[in-house]
Amino acid sequence: MGLTLTLTDADLPASPAFIEFLHATLTGEAYHAGSWYQQEEESLASNEGRFENIQEKAHAVVADPKGKEHLLRSYRFFKELLTGNVHTLRDLARFRFFFVIGIPRTGGTYLTKQLFRAGGINYTTVQNALAHDGFPHLARLSFKEQGNVHTNGLLQLAEYLTMVEVFFGEHGRLAYRGGIIVPKKFTKAVYYFDLLRELFEANADYLVTLRHPLSTCRSVLDKSGGMPADGKFAVRSTIERWTLEDWLHWGVGEEQLRQMDYVECFLGYWKRFHFQMAMAGIPSMPGTRLVPYGAESMSGAAKKLYTEFGLKMEPEAFKTAEPPRFSGDQERAAQQAVEEVAGFWRSLGLAFPTEALAAKL
């Protein structure tokens, strides 16, 4: 037709985390790892003040020929994600992705760390955006203050894939089934799994972490400041914000949500997350492994991976928590949520490990 559509970086600017990564790569500075690998602090990390000088770093990245090349590479990936005409994205076939998928506080951080150890990479030095949840921010479609969440999410995915090329192209040493191992904790993969499946086809494995909703809820509370005094839902941490977003998607207003019982609110999020996981087809993928929460299960899964990789090493110890204490009504509500998820999975021909989760409650 002869039409030309123009989008500039003013319309779709590079993400601060991506600029930060490129700047550290070019200058040799330490990556911003934050505390993603510390289970006790997970989900409480703050970015306040982190990107204050991001404009200076952006100018430095653009002024560097290599930095500009990486930026252009990310936008090229983005264009292919938008159009579906995949060419340069095929270069990613040299990587073997290990996506660790599960609702937060289910042991995914532990498995991600053990995968980095397998590759001989010190996980405390890996930028949090490269290793952990939150980036890319793939979420349900909405138009927010920052624009189209879907489009921005695709750009961040393109940036993440560029980061993979840069970081693992230099530091990746361990190969498995023809590809360099790339670990990624990716909670939000449940919302965009079709995209991952299209991109990586047979070049990905999925470690699905599962945990009883009450022990998960207790862990979220412990990392978010404890149960609110009135027992009502509150947003103080990243995980609680994701819980809020889930309910908003289902048509429940924020004011109404803040009047809901905290446990009831979290159970709704937990239940729908696992419904979505099943509907996405994640549990039925050939490369999927279900890993119930617990020291024996988690360390056993890591040990099995090491054996498959041909490594003679032991996984780190897995930290467990004391059994949670909730009221009888809350326990019954949680049991109903588990039964509903198990029944839904069963209707799709999938087996939900109910007994394994109850044993580690």
What are these regions (language model features)?
Residues 120, 151-152, 300-304, 318:
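Compositionally biased, flexible interaction segments
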Residues 188-315:
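PAPS-dependent sulfotransferase catalytic domain
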Residues 1-166, 227-260, 314-361:
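PAPS-dependent sulfotransferase catalytic core
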Residues 99-102, 122-126, 182-185, 205-210, ...:
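A structural signal for short, well-ordered beta-strand segments and their strand-loop junctions
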Residues 132-136, 216-220, 323-324:
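Short, charged, surface-exposed secondary-structure boundary motifs
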Residues 113-192, 199, 233, 242-255, ...:
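PAPS-dependent sulfation machinery
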Residues 1-7, 82-98, 164-201, 323:
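Conserved, well-structured beta-alpha core segment at the onset of a catalytic domain
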